Amino acid sequence: WDKDIMLIRLNKPVSYSEHIAPLSLPSSPPIVGSVCRPHCANINLLDYEVCRTAHPQFRLPATSRILCAGVLEGGIDTCHR
């Protein structure tokens, strides 16, 4: 869970800071479908504690580095379209 990478489209530009910076991607990424499967979905960003409370079975670590996103009712998240 911790330190995964995802792409999000922002509604407005951001200023770079200690916590916001460009990320260099590998020049030779893996073949799509071999180890990665891209998904696209319109989802909501949720408060991290909301995710921890809603899904105790996942035993999410107590860290603020995780971006909580999806639909609380289920069915759409990083693994499902």
From Swiss-Prot:
Keywords: Disulfide bond, Fibrinogenolytic toxin, Hemostasis impairing toxin, Hydrolase, Protease, Secreted, Serine protease, Toxin. InterPro entries: Peptidase_S1_PA, Peptidase_S1_PA_chymotrypsin, Trypsin_dom. Pfam families: Trypsin. Its EC number is 3.4.21.-. The active site is at D4. It is found in: Secreted. Its main location: secreted. Expressed by the vanom gland. One of its GO terms (cellular component) is extracellular region. One of its GO terms (biological process) is proteolysis. Thrombin-like snake venom serine protease. Belongs to the peptidase S1 family. Monomer. This is Thrombin-like enzyme collinein-3. It comes from Crotalus durissus collilineatus (Brazilian rattlesnake).
